[in-house]
Every structure is written in structure tokens, then in C-alpha cells.
Amino acid sequence: MKTLYSLRRSYPVETLFNGTIALAGRDQETTGFAWWAGNARLINLSGKLLGAHVAHAGLIVFWAGAMNLFEVAHFVPEKPMYEQGLILLPHLATLGWGVGPGGEIVDTFPYFVSGVLHLISSAVLGFGGIYHALIGPETLEESFPFFGYVWKDRNKMTTILGIHLILLGAGAFLLVLKALYFGGVYDTWAPGGGDVRKITNPTLNPSAIFGYLLKSPFGGEGWIVSVDNLEDIIGGHVWLGSICIFGGIWHILTKPFAWARRAFVWSGEAYLSYSLAALSLFGFIACCFVWFNNTAYPSEFYGPTGPEASQAQAFTFLVRDQRLGASVGSAQGPTGLGKYLMRSPTGEIIFGGETMRFWDLRAPWLEPLRGPNGLDLSKLRKDIQPWQERRSAEYMTHAPLGSSNSVGGVATEINAVNYVSPRSWLSTSHFVLGFFLFIGHLWHAGRARAAAAGFEKGIDRDFEPVLSMTPLN
């Protein structure tokens, strides 16, 4: 019987398939992988694998540019950004481009420029991808040894890791430069309802920056997600950028220690599994960051957070009923607790009613009304500004709830709008992608470990029913 898998040790795990289908001269017989296994056929062809990666980058950048221009074409400056189904423009606005006081979009030309630059970049990447996939050398080791590699070469692998870390660090410093020198970034906490400003004094104190990592993730603590000022965010990027760059230099100059050589599996599929695990972790952290944090993801662009929409509703009705003569400090609700305001178990004055569970919300439209012991009753009576009323009324009807068929908002809220918050989309997509990346990590880690242990052939396939069936083609 014909052998249905490659006997070469360098292709450790195969999936059985119709071996007669050939694609570009790289069929299952010669590579051990079927056509649909995609880049697995290129594991030992560094030149072709480079082409696949560059072309993939071109597709990503093309999508970014095309979607960017699509959003610019559909953008209505008179409506809130978060009401228009935009997923890219909020990021550009957060970086301070085209934004005026209060988060108002005053100029869409920078967004157009961004889209065009991405399209041009995608053309360059696309050309490079096609060149390396079809024309360039199959392997780089002979012609361009600097770019060549062997997956087992531990020293070369950590050198490549170091180069990647330096590039990541440079990326972190791009945000730092934008915030410090090139026009600043949007600060939702700027007085009067947010504005673009330069961050002149980033936090560099290590106890402040790394203190976030030591915080509890629960309640009012909130781990790194609790960061609520741009000084700490930009200072954190200074620290992370520096750590990435110095770590990259370290990995380029050193060889892996003996314990690391023993602990890790050193194969292409193992590196894939490590990368998927890291991306999965990033996805889960980003999910929480987007959902709860309104400093890095300003509500003016992404819509309010869940707690923010809830507290905004309590605030809106407090303002209304206070105007109608209600004594908001003493009025009781149906449970005997305060209808508008109540005391938390530790004595702070917080909003009453169902929103009491969101007592730890911090939002720029609400913080000016706090005193040393929670909400300040005299400020609530005398100091509420029109912009605070307008913003809370807007946020009240734009809770980040909704389903994929775009029926959004609070089900019981008669003023809710038919929309899905970009905050919901961004948070949910990162959770779902993070989950699937984690499954991919388990899958590829299992295969890589099995190959390293030498039992990669799996169960005996001699009596598999599919072997007696007619080939698909």
C-alpha cells in the first residue's frame, strides 16, 4: 500500500488527505502536508514563507486602509462617533487627530490621509509578498544568511525574538512621541469635557507604573485596567518601550541558558503555539480594558462603559427631579434606601437605586461633583454644568448593550437608540478572538510536544475507512 505520509523527521505531524492533489509542485508526498494546510507546506522554505507573511501583512494593511476610507465616506460630523458603527475612526480620534474641545470632530482630512497611506503601504507589501512567493529564492539561508534560519537553531531564534522585541519597543515609543511632541493625544479628563493636549509630564516613577500590576483585579482596584490618567498611560509606554528594547538587545547578544534550552520545545510549531498563547492573553486583557476603561478608550468616541451608562441614567433623573422640587438628599425609594442618593457600607455618598453596584465608576462628567466623602450634595445642588447634563443624557440612552443584529440599548429604556456600541464590538471581538487563539495554542502546543516526544504518528491508520473510499478528485 502507498505510504500516505512523509517519512521525513522534519515534518513531524501530518493530516491524512488525498495525496494526488498537487499545488505549485508542493504536494502532500513531498511536504507531508495537504494543500489546505497552507503555510505548513512552507515550513522549511524560508523564502516562500517570507512571501506568505509579507502578503498577509499586505492584506491586513489593505483592509485597514479600505475600511478607513469607507468610514470617512460615511462619517456624519453632527452625530456622535459611537452612534455610526465606526471601528477605526475612534482609534484615530483618540490619538488626537481631527478632534476639538469636547471630543467634537472638526477635521476629517487626517482620517483620509491615514486611509490613503495604508492603501499605498498595502500595495508595496502586496508586491513584496507576490515577489517572494513566486519569484524570489525558495530558501534564504544560502543567498541572505542574515535573513535565513533553521527552526532548531536556538541562538538564531532568540536573535529573531530580540529583533521583534526592539520593533515592539519602537512602536510603544511612537505613541510616546505623538503624545509628547507631535500634537498630543485626546484627554477625556481635560477641564470642560475633554480636549487634545500634549502630555508634558509622563509618570516615570516605577512604583506608580508597576503598582498597577500588583493591584487586585476586583472591585475598585481593577489591576492595570484601572489607569485613569494619560500621564500614567504614556509613562507606562516609556517603561514598556524601554524594557522591550533592552530585552531585545539582550536576546540578540546572548544565547539561551541551559534551563531554557531544556524547558522549551524548539520547533516552528512550538514557536507558533507560544505566539498564539501570548496573543490570546493580549486579547483577554484588551477585552477588559476596552469594556471598563474610559481614559484609554474615551467615551466620546467609543460610547459609554456599562457602569457609565447606568450612573448617567441615575444622574439624569436626579437633575430632572431636583428641578421639579424633589429633595434628592432625603427622598426614599421603594426599598427604603435613598431614591437618588445613598450611603455605601463604608459611608461614601453614592447614587441610589440599581446603579449602586456601579459605585466605583469614575467618569470625567461626574468627578467634578465629588467631595472628600463621595458625591457632594452642595455641588449637586449648585454646580452641575449644562455639558454634564447633556453628556449624561446622551450616555444614558447609549448603553453598551446589544446583539449582532444591531438591536441595541437597554431593553426597558423607551429612549434607547437602535445601535450597537463600538465598545461592545471591540470588547466582544477581542474576547472571542482571544478564546480561539487560546484553542489554537493548545492544539499546536500539543502537536509540537508530541513531535518532540517522538509519538507524533498517532493511532494506527491501516484500517481507517477513508482509505477504501474513492479519492475526492
Swiss-Prot record:
InterPro entries: PS_antenna-like, PS_II_antenna-like_sf, PSII_PsbC, PSII_PsbC_sf
Residues holding [CaMn4O5] cluster: E367
Record carries keyword Transmembrane: yes
Cellular component GO terms held in the UniProt record: chloroplast thylakoid membrane; photosystem II
One GO term (biological process): photosynthetic electron transport in photosystem II
Membrane topology according to the record: Multi-pass membrane protein
Pfam families: PSII
Cofactor note: Binds multiple chlorophylls and provides some of the ligands for the Ca-4Mn-5O cluster of the oxygen-evolving complex. It may also provide a ligand for a Cl- that is required for oxygen evolution. PSII binds additional chlorophylls, carotenoids and specific lipids.
Keywords: Acetylation, Chlorophyll, Chloroplast, Chromophore, Manganese, Membrane, Metal-binding, Phosphoprotein, Photosynthesis, Photosystem II, Plastid, Thylakoid, Transmembrane, Transmembrane helix
Superkingdom of source: Eukaryota
Location of this chain's protein in the cell: Plastid, Chloroplast thylakoid membrane
Membrane-spanning ranges: 69-93, 134-155, 178-200, 255-275, 291-312, 447-471
GO molecular function: chlorophyll binding; electron transporter, transferring electrons within the cyclic electron transport pathway of photosynthesis activity; metal ion binding
Main location: plastid
Keyword Cell wall biogenesis/degradation: no
SUPFAM superfamilies given in the database record: Photosystem II antenna protein-like
Positions where Phosphothreonine occurs in the chain: T15
Propeptide section residues: 1-14
Residues found modified as N-acetylthreonine: T15
Subunit structure, interactors included: PSII is composed of 1 copy each of membrane proteins PsbA, PsbB, PsbC, PsbD, PsbE, PsbF, PsbH, PsbI, PsbJ, PsbK, PsbL, PsbM, PsbT, PsbX, PsbY, PsbZ, Psb30/Ycf12, at least 3 peripheral proteins of the oxygen-evolving complex and a large number of cofactors. It forms dimeric complexes.
NCBIfam families, alphabetized: psbC
Function: One of the components of the core complex of photosystem II (PSII). It binds chlorophyll and helps catalyze the primary light-induced photochemical processes of PSII. PSII is a light-driven water:plastoquinone oxidoreductase, using light energy to abstract electrons from H(2)O, generating O(2) and a proton gradient subsequently used for ATP formation.
Family membership noted in the UniProt record: Belongs to the PsbB/PsbC family. PsbC subfamily.
Annotated HAMAP family: PSII_PsbC_CP43
Protein name: Photosystem II CP43 reaction center protein
Protein's organism: Abies alba (Edeltanne)
